[in-house]
Amino acid sequence: MRPSKRAADEMRTISFERGVSKHAEGSCLVKFGDTHVLCTASLEEKVPGWMRNTGKGWVTAEYGMLPRSTGERMRREAAAGKQGGRTQEIQRLIGRSLRAVVDMQALGEMQITVDCDVIQADGGTRTAAITGGWVALHECLRWMEARQMVRVEKVLKDHVAAISCGIYEGVPVLDLDYAEDSVAETDSNFVMTGKGGIVEIQGTAEGVPFSEEEFGALMKLARSGIDRLVSLQKMAVA
């Protein structure tokens, strides 16, 4: 039995709230159960130096956790003077995931930065950030379209979403919360597009290796979860 009493293939309650930031061109507060992430998409009408005069745009991401997003206060990374390795890994993952569904040529020489700030963490912060980050990006592009800068459907080629799966007490389960994630025998994250394309898979065994059959079960769970997330994204931006 899962600590949350959920079925093996049952996700937490997922919600997207758009337009939560007064200043950002696009924003979304995404909730995966008790994991809450504020995603904002900010437009700059310029690109990094290495992309100038290419006619292409760029999408990048930053990620951070508020000090009391966890059970005990975390020291701000800014106070430490540098980002931790985990933070850098996650924000690169978010950026890669979003770029996988963006036509940079159609975006033109502009950059969109998606900031993902974890307000409350209960497992799956990176998957929530990717999924909510797509909604914030969509809202930014919609803002641009209203000003005749781009066409959303030309720039954003597909949905992208992410979900965690793992093996908890010998059973493959979908969308792990912290109580499961912290003791799972296997923990994995799947990033996929709305059309079913695989963007990234991260999978780790904790002590006991997992089999190809178990991986197949996790993949099946992930696909069902991504399908549901994409449906929720569609409703959120409709």
Swiss-Prot record:
GO biological process terms held by the UniProt record: rRNA catabolic process; rRNA processing; tRNA processing
Single GO MF annotation: 3'-5'-RNA exonuclease activity
Residues binding phosphate: 86, 124-126
Transferase among keywords: yes
Keywords for this protein: Nucleotidyltransferase, RNA-binding, rRNA processing, Transferase, tRNA processing, tRNA-binding
EC number(s) recorded for this UniProt protein: 2.7.7.56
Physiological role: Phosphorolytic 3'-5' exoribonuclease that plays an important role in tRNA 3'-end maturation. Removes nucleotide residues following the 3'-CCA terminus of tRNAs; can also add nucleotides to the ends of RNA molecules by using nucleoside diphosphates as substrates, but this may not be physiologically important. Probably plays a role in initiation of 16S rRNA degradation (leading to ribosome degradation) during starvation.
Quaternary structure and interacting proteins, as annotated: Homohexameric ring arranged as a trimer of dimers.
UniProt family annotation: Belongs to the RNase PH family.
NCBIfam families: RNasePH
UniProt-recorded name of the protein: Ribonuclease PH
Organism, as annotated: Brucella melitensis biotype 2 (strain ATCC 23457)
